[in-house]
């Protein structure tokens, strides 16, 4: 059967690494008594558009916890340059077809709405010329706009498809008149958008990605998606259909989630 006639399958992959610099052992830290990675995996199970899901880790302790909870686990190498390189290894191990789609679900976002997972997958399906898809949300606060930990994205409409032009930790786009004025800035430009680290990939891209060397801008900005743009790939992008609750990067974030009602983690 030709690939054009074969069904496109969608796979959710949740990368889980213990070596977080700001919050060690993050996947196994508990929220209301349950390891965070299990909260995330249970969210993935609610995404009924997906054919399957798995957890990708390089740590035996994470693998043990997830396997004992009944989840599919893929052991990966520990020396990947980026999360996308890790996904490529998973796709190769699983033998997924080149035309399949992989949704990368962050392992530190236990409150992510499954709606956003489906949105990013649908976005890629609808843009046949793009090899990746991702989401963004408007930035209003100026301090958020200029903070280097907040990744900004600028995009353009091409053939009725919105596609990313560039991602940066710098405040882009720059309003020249505001920058040159002596007034204190309190608001970001009207067309400032924050990139949300949620991706859908074609497996064919993952197969190419691992053969590309890290690119100058990718290394400079420490943003793996720039490797795709620098190699001529298109990345579809859209404004998130609903807010994405903050994930867990610090102990304060973890404390905040533990202080929330248990019902906040349960979907109707």
UniProtKB/Swiss-Prot annotation:
GO biological process terms on file: CMP-keto-3-deoxy-D-manno-octulosonic acid biosynthetic process; lipopolysaccharide biosynthetic process
- Give the Gene Ontology MF terms in alphabetical order: 3-deoxy-manno-octulosonate cytidylyltransferase activity
Q: Tell me the compartments it is located in.
A: Cytoplasm
Instruction: Look up the record and name the pathway of this protein.
Output: Nucleotide-sugar biosynthesis; CMP-3-deoxy-D-manno-octulosonate biosynthesis; CMP-3-deoxy-D-manno-octulosonate from 3-deoxy-D-manno-octulosonate and CTP: step 1/1; Bacterial outer membrane biogenesis; lipopolysaccharide biosynthesis
Q: By its UniProt entry, which Pfam families does this protein fall under? A: CTP_transf_3
Q: What is its EC number?
A: 2.7.7.38
Which key words tag this protein in UniProt? Cytoplasm, Lipopolysaccharide biosynthesis, Nucleotidyltransferase, Transferase
Known catalytic reactions: 3-deoxy-alpha-D-manno-oct-2-ulosonate + CTP = CMP-3-deoxy-beta-D-manno-octulosonate + diphosphate
Q: What GO CC annotations are associated with the protein?
A: cytosol
Family affiliation? Belongs to the KdsB family.
What is the role of the protein in this entry? Activates KDO (a required 8-carbon sugar) for incorporation into bacterial lipopolysaccharide in Gram-negative bacteria.
Q: Which NCBIfam families match?
A: kdsB (TIGR00466), PRK05450.1-5 (NF003952), PRK13368.1 (NF009905)
| Record's protein name | 3-deoxy-manno-octulosonate cytidylyltransferase
Species lineage: Bacteria, Pseudomonadati, Pseudomonadota, Gammaproteobacteria, Moraxellales
Which gene is annotated as encoding this protein in its UniProt record? kdsB
């Amino acid at each position: 059967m030709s690939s054009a006639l074969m069904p496109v399958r969608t796979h959710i992959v949740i990368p889980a690494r213990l070596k977080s610099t700001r919050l060690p052992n993050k996947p196994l830290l508990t929220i209301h008594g349950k390891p965070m990675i299990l909260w995330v995996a249970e969210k993935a199970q609610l995404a009924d558009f997906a054919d399957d899901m798995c957890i990708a880790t390089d740590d035996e302790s994470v693998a043990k916890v997830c396997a004992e909870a009944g989840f599919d686990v893929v052991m990966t190498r520990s020396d990947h340059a980026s999360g996308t390189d890790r996904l490529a290894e998973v796709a190769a191990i699983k033998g997924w077809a080149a035309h399949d789609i992989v949704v990368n679900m962050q392992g530190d976002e236990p409150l992510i709405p499954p709606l956003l997972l489906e949105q990013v997958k649908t976005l890629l399906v609808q843009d046949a010329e793009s090899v990746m898809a991702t989401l963004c949300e408007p930035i209003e606060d100026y301090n958020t706009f200029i903070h280097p930990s907040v990744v900004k994205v600028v995009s353009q409409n091409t053939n009725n498809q919105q596609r990313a032009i560039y991602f940066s930790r710098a405040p882009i786009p720059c309003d020249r008149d505001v920058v040159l004025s002596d007034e204190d800035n309190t608001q970001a430009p009207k067309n400032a958008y924050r990139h949300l680290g949620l991706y859908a990939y074609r497996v064919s891209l993952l197969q190419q990605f691992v053969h590309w060397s890290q690119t100058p801008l990718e290394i400079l900005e420490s943003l793996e998606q720039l490797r795709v743009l620098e190699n001529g790939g298109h990345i579809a992008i859209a404004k998130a259909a609903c807010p994405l609750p903050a994930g867990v990067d610090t102990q304060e974030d973890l404390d905040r989630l533990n202080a929330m009602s248990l019902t906040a983690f349960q979907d109707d």
